[in-house]
Regions:
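Basic, Lys/Arg-enriched alpha-helical interface segments
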Residues: 1-90, 98-104, 112-117
Length: 117
């Protein structure tokens, strides 16, 4: 019975402070109509890892930090100058726009599908 008060005292010292429980609100997310069409087309094709695409999207929504180097995330140039692109796997890409509080998923597909005229 003597261990119970000791255990209670130990648990009280492990209590989190109010500051350690606070977090920044995740970014608001939106999808372009073209992205939704891309999602349906890619999902039905069975050639692309849609779970990995969803993983990248969730990381972009939840984190303020840049994606890890494995995603090959970079800004685009030319007519896509205000967009970013990350590589989901091989030639499978995600194009998006982002700022501190908002992210918009614009397109997804291969280089030739997204950038050929």
């Amino acid at each position: 019975m003597r261990a119970l008060p000791l255990l209670t005292n130990c648990l009280l010292t492990l209590k989190k402070t109010a500051a350690s429980k606070r977090a920044v609100l995740p970014r608001a997310a939106d999808y372009a109509k073209a992205f939704l069409k891309d999602w349906q087309r890619l999902s039905h094709s069975g050639r692309f890892d849609m779970v990995r695409l969803k993983e990248a999207m969730l990381l972009l929504i939840a984190n303020d930090a840049p994606l890890a180097p494995e995603w090959l995330d970079h800004s685009l140039k030319g007519e896509w100058a205000d967009h970013r692109e990350c590589h989901i796997g091989g030639d499978f890409l995600l194009i998006y726009q982002v700022d501190a509080n908002w992210i918009n998923f614009v397109r997804s597909g291969t280089h030739s599908e997204l950038f050929s005229n």
